[in-house]
Swiss-Prot record:
Stretches with biased composition (Polar residues): 242-253, 476-492, 527-540
Domain of life: Eukaryota
Organism the protein comes from: Dictyostelium discoideum
Ranges for region Disordered: 26-120, 158-289, 304-617, 635-720, 802-863
Compositional bias ranges of the Low complexity kind: 41-105, 163-241, 304-475, 548-590, 635-666, 696-707, 813-853
Basic and acidic residues bias: start-end ranges: 606-617, 854-863
Compositional bias segments (type: Acidic residues): 265-285
Name this protein carries in UniProt: Putative uncharacterized protein DDB_G0289263
Length: 932
């Protein structure tokens, strides 16, 4: 359906348009309302579903904007929030009256339509077909034009246009698109009425946050007076018992509101909108067809109400998010949060019930929202009560965002803005908790204070140290965990788990930026349409298995059932085995998703290959028998070589090369599992114990080799090549191998001594295996830092410094640190000691590097800066970032540009088709303007 696709697009722009009056949301909802008879309430529900996630992410984006914006902006938000929270209930009810009448497809009034931001496009093709049929039956040109809808549609300044990049506008916070939140934030103290009217397009919503009321406007399809379905956010006027047929009841009153009157004469108006059915037989006949279609779709019960309540939840979440970020900057938020908590309490009953229904609908977003919203609503109440300690809200943000769209983006945006904007969140939170820089630590502290928070606080309390350290590592070191509580989740969540093909605005930022000050170079997180699913990397697919793009979540919360639930389990129970996952997330391979290496990788990230792989590469001309021949066989050859030197030639023992078979009396046991080895001289069939080796000619086929294996097992004489100088060559090779082996032993001993001198005591105690020598760099770092944790903070900086300076090189003990951390996850106290010390030190160092030394890092688009594709490629080449991340991010960047241009062109063409012109939203013009 065009509607569904457009709803998805609008869902995208919801994030943008939460800041921008939710212009697209209003468009979608208005369109869907416009086509109520066509049974597209499901599309409304779909757009609401998208809007739910988008509202959360959009508000989180706004929070990030608030964090990025001046404190004055946040103060404005707080002022707005104070007014909004006091008026939320009334505003919701008022919003229910904002869309008083709905215009049906036949052109008759179904009530008043909201004056602005209402692009009545829904199912434009079907709609225009119906209108054309109806218009062809009318002689009066004005009536025909009215029915055709050419004077029904008017675009206000919704930030849509042929060349208008909503994402960039959202990033820049300077465009008219951002008038809604940013202008409100900037201008609400001066122009609450104007901005709110422009943003909300409702005289009723002067006091509301534009996000909240715009979301309400999107949901308010409601007309209690006109007996239409009440989609009121705050009201109880609708329910699962509302029959859809009620919409189409002919007895429904059709008041003609003066605000939407056309300029038709009274006579013409009475003819066109007469309630006399005798003059409307053509319309009624056409209407019945669509009513039949609509009734077939709806079966008399609206489950859409559930989705709509999710939007209410998201509005509450949006309130809390805005208040959280505002709390970070302002004390006024206590009142706001209390008011919001009251709203959350009002909506909790509705939203919880509806969220369960959404879970039944099989939408993973809603299921996640169930966890998030239920926990968050309860958490919101606690958090709102404790909003002075903003960290609870932040922890909720972590959980919520993680649950919501893999909005790791949101988590890391919130957490990263909290961590990066140590000025705002962390400093303020550090004012509350002077011990740690990280929000998650603060969250854990707050969680310790607030054990009543359902999932976030209790689970964070269960994992206090795990989440502290992991979130510290995830937030500041961005351990690209999709599943841990933070992980840049912002953009790192590169999994497209939903059907939509669109990724976030700057997926590039995702893993690299998630924690580090790199976020500051990205500008606000507004550029990330988090509602959009994220495509999985190949490693992720291998790690989790190829999952269907869309699936309904299982009924249980098995942490292994899906990434969602895995993620839920991290936040909900014991981090869903989140101890090891978070540790893996932080250290082993940068995320439960296997961003660095699969969990079963024998080498943890950064650990260098064992020496035999380096010194005895199979590509060397010398046959690499050390890997394949048993040690005692090597010792035997050494012993024989010594005898050769000591004894006279006549008494010299025969030397058996590895290619030859020693006398049958020398190898008691028969070989067990022969294997074939390729060498420059040919193939070798060797047994596990290395006692019996056979050389085949170089041109021997594999089939003949298999027969040789059988021959060896049957004690048949081995095939020995007749090489004249072969034994001499083998002797030289064995001498070389002996020398290499001795050198290796010496090097290992020296390096182990150095390591023992340099390794801190707590690491020596925790070592569970001998250190693997590193041949690429003999010096061990004085103050080891886990490259895995540094990687995301300053990948470009650390990847360069780790080679040149010993201070930032990876300690071989890092794998041992991983073990310690897993143990520490089980033992939270140990985690605090090791992880808080190490990770906080690392975080401080990383922060110092980011803030003070300002390492060279790729430039991401700032507030007023665009980054073209070539420049993006060049920046990535210079920053020595991971190639797979770059490729993924580049592909997503291209897809974003295509999607943005498609949306803009689509709307622009739609405007052209309807003979529309873009005008200033400040003009209070009638929607029905025949002069269009």
């Amino acid at each position: 359906m065009v509607n569904t696709l457009y709803n998805n697009n609008n869902g995208n722009n919801n994030i943008i348009n939460n800041n921008n009056n939710n212009g697209f949301n209003n468009i979608n909802n208005g369109q869907n309302l416009h086509r109520l008879e066509n049974g597209h309430n499901n599309n409304i529900a779909n757009s609401n579903n998208i809007n739910n996630n988008n509202n959360i992410s959009g508000n989180i984006v706004n929070n990030n904007n608030n964090n990025n914006n001046n404190n004055s902006n946040n103060n404005n938000n707080n002022n707005n929030n104070n007014n909004n929270n006091n008026n939320n209930n009334s505003n919701n009810s008022n919003n229910s009256n904002n869309i008083n009448n709905i215009i049906s497809s036949d052109g008759r009034r179904r009530g008043s339509i909201n004056k602005s931001n209402m692009l009545t496009h829904s199912n434009l093709s079907n709609n225009l077909k119906i209108r054309n049929k109806l218009a062809n039956q009318i002689d009066n040109e004005e009536k025909r034009q009215h029915i055709l809808g050419k004077n029904l549609i008017k675009l206000t300044n919704m930030g849509i246009g042929p060349n208008n990049n909503n994402h960039n506008n959202h990033q820049n916070n300077n465009n008219s698109n951002n008038n809604n939140n940013n202008n409100n934030n900037n201008n609400n103290n001066n122009n609450n009425n104007n901005n709110n009217n422009n943003n909300n397009n409702n005289n009723n919503n002067n006091n509301n946050n534009n996000n909240n009321n715009n979301n309400n406007n999107n949901l308010v399809i409601n007309n209690n007076k006109n007996n239409y379905i009440n989609y009121n956010n705050g009201g109880n006027n609708y329910g699962n018992n509302t029959p859809v047929n009620y919409i189409h009841n002919n007895s429904t009153p059709r008041p003609r509101h003066s605000s939407l009157r056309t300029n038709l004469s009274d006579e013409e108006d009475s003819v066109l909108y007469s309630s006399d059915d005798s003059e409307e037989s053509d319309y009624e006949e056409e209407e019945k067809k669509h009513l039949k279609y609509a009734n077939r779709n709806f079966s008399g019960v609206l489950n859409n109400n559930n989705n709509i309540n999710n939007n209410n939840m998201n509005n509450n979440i949006n309130y809390n998010f805005n208040n959280n970020n505002n709390n970070v900057n302002n004390v006024n938020i206590n009142n706001n949060n209390n008011n919001n908590s009251s709203n959350n309490n009002n909506n909790n009953s509705n939203n919880n019930n509806q969220l369960y229904n959404n879970h039944n609908n099989g939408n993973p977003n809603f299921y996640i929202n169930n966890n998030n919203n239920n926990s968050n609503n309860i958490g919101h109440n606690n958090n709102n009560n404790n909003n002075n300690v903003n960290n609870n809200n932040i922890s909720n943000n972590n959980n919520l965002n993680n649950f919501n769209n893999y909005n790791y983006n949101n988590n890391n945006n919130n957490n990263n803005n909290n961590n990066n904007n140590n000025n705002n969140n962390n400093n303020n939170n550090n004012n509350n908790n002077n011990n740690n820089n990280n929000n998650n630590n603060n969250n854990n502290n707050n969680n310790n204070n607030n054990n009543n928070n359902n999932n976030n606080n209790n689970n964070n309390n269960n994992n206090n140290n795990n989440n502290n350290n992991n979130n510290n590592n995830n937030n500041e070191n961005y351990v690209g965990s999709s599943l841990s509580n933070s992980a840049d989740n912002t953009e790192s969540s590169k999994w497209r788990i939903y059907p939509s093909t669109r990724a976030r605005q700057r997926s590039i930022a995702s893993e690299e930026d998630s924690l580090g000050s790199r976020r500051s170079s990205l500008g606000s997180a507004n550029d990330i349409p988090n509602s959009y699913p994220i495509s999985p990397t190949k490693q992720q697919l291998l790690h989790y298995g190829m999952q269907s793009p869309v699936y309904s979540p299982p009924n249980n919360l098995s942490p292994l059932s899906s990434p969602y639930l895995h993620h839920n389990s991290n936040n909900n129970s014991n981090n869903g085995g989140g101890n090891s996952n978070n540790n893996n997330t932080n250290f082993n391979y940068g995320g439960n998703i296997g961003l660095e290496r699969p969990k079963t990788s024998p080498l943890s990230y950064g650990e260098r290959d064992p020496p035999h792989v380096i010194n005895h590469d199979r590509r060397l001309k010398t046959p690499s028998f050390i890997d394949d021949i048993n040690e005692n066989n090597l010792q035997q050859s050494q012993h024989q070589h010594q005898q050769q030197q000591q004894q006279p030639q006549s008494q010299q023992q025969p030397f058996y090369s590895p290619y030859q078979s020693p006398p049958s009396s020398s190898h008691g046991n028969r070989p067990k599992t022969p294997k074939i080895i390729s060498t420059p001289e040919g193939y070798i069939i060797s047994s596990d114990d290395g006692s019996r080796l056979v050389v085949s000619p170089p041109n021997t086929s594999i089939s003949s080799l298999s027969s040789m294996v059988d021959d060896n097992h049957h004690n048949q004489p081995p095939l020995v090549p007749n090489f004249s100088s072969f034994q001499q060559q083998q002797q030289l090779r064995q001498l070389q191998q002996q020398q290499l082996h001795q050198q290796q032993l010496l090097q290992q001993q020296q390096q182990q001594q150095q390591q023992q001198q340099q390794v801190p005591t707590h690491q020596q105690q925790s070592q569970s295996r001998p250190q693997t020598p590193i041949y690429l760099s003999q010096q061990q770092p004085q103050n080891p830092i886990d490259l895995m944790s540094n990687r995301r903070l300053n990948s470009a900086q650390n990847m360069k410094l780790s080679v040149s300076s010993p201070q930032l090189g990876r300690d071989v003990n890092s794998s041992n640190n991983n073990k310690n951390i897993s143990n520490n996850n089980n033992n939270n106290n140990n985690n605090n000691n090791n992880n808080n010390n190490n990770n906080n030190n690392n975080n401080n160092k990383n922060n110092n590097i980011n803030n003070n030394s300002e390492p060279k890092k790729p430039k991401f688009p700032l507030e007023d800066e665009k980054l073209d594709r070539d420049q993006l490629i060049n920046e990535y080449k210079e920053s020595s970032l991971r190639l797979d991340l770059f490729v993924n991010s580049l592909d997503e960047y291209d897809q974003q540009q295509r999607d943005i241009s498609d949306i803009d062109n689509y709307i622009y063409n739609l405007c052209l088709c309807n003979n529309l012109e873009k005008h200033d939203s400040k003009e209070d013009e009638m929607l029905f303007d025949p002069n269009l």
